[in-house]
Amino acid sequence: MTTPSRRRLMRDFKKLQEDPPAGVSGAPTEDNILTWEAIIFGPQETPFEDGTFKLSLEFTEEYPNKPPTVKFISKMFHPNVYADGSICLDILQNRWSPTYDVAAILTSIQSLLDEPNPNSPANSLAAQLYQENRREYEKRVQQIVEQSWLNFGENEGDAVLKDDVEIEEIAAPGANDADDDRMDEGASGSNA
């Protein structure tokens, strides 16, 4: 059964595929359109430049009337990111609007990387260093940027980069299993 929430998420996914914002990528997991994986690339000319950061987005059937729960999966050192990866961002809380879509959420988080709000800290050490010792703050950010290179492509981030995922396949899992089986047979039978 397709609910309004699921239809909206299918539209959000289609929009992300057809008109992707610079530096962000996201897709539903293979078996659940309410669970997404995303990648945010660190904005250029910022301490986060060249970083590749994985996130998870958990939607409910109340989306778009209620925001998703968004967390960094990648390690993050930022004034507005809690130790568990949860993000302190007004549009994900008290300033949420149903007009926001997945692209807007991801680009807002990407902007937050460069423009933290140290007055509303989720990580007090990061906020303090950002305000009082920018050099040490940037050194710690560089460490997580380098760590993001080592961890990229492991486990959960792989589905995000698939360009061939069809919306119908996500909405109706298993619909294309026969195609997948044929592809697997062809791959295992080839002599390289």
Curated annotation (Swiss-Prot):
PROSITE patterns: UBC_1, UBC_2. The active site is at residue 88. Signal peptide: none annotated. Pathway: Protein modification; protein ubiquitination. Gene3D superfamilies: Ubiquitin Conjugating Enzyme (3.10.110.10). Pfam families: UQ_con. InterPro entries: Ub_conjugating_enzyme, UBQ-conjugat_E2_core, UBQ-conjugating_AS, UBQ-conjugating_enzyme/RWD. Residues 1-28, 171-192 are annotated as: Disordered. Its EC number is 2.3.2.23. It catalyses: S-ubiquitinyl-[E1 ubiquitin-activating enzyme]-L-cysteine + [E2 ubiquitin-conjugating enzyme]-L-cysteine = [E1 ubiquitin-activating enzyme]-L-cysteine + S-ubiquitinyl-[E2 ubiquitin-conjugating enzyme]-L-cysteine. One of its GO terms (cellular component) is ubiquitin conjugating enzyme complex. CDD domains: UBCc_UBE2A_2B. Residues 4-150 form the UBC core domain. One of its GO terms (molecular function) is ATP binding. It comes from the Eukaryota. One of its GO terms (biological process) is protein polyubiquitination. Keywords: ATP-binding, Nucleotide-binding, Transferase, Ubl conjugation pathway. Disruption phenotype: Worms are viable, fertile, and do not show any obvious anomaly. Catalyzes the covalent attachment of ubiquitin to other proteins. Belongs to the ubiquitin-conjugating enzyme family. Interacts with ubr-1 and rfp-1. Interacts with ubc-13. PANTHER family: UBIQUITIN-CONJUGATING ENZYME E2. This is Ubiquitin-conjugating enzyme E2 1. The lineage of its organism: Eukaryota, Metazoa, Ecdysozoa, Nematoda, Chromadorea. The gene is ubc-1.
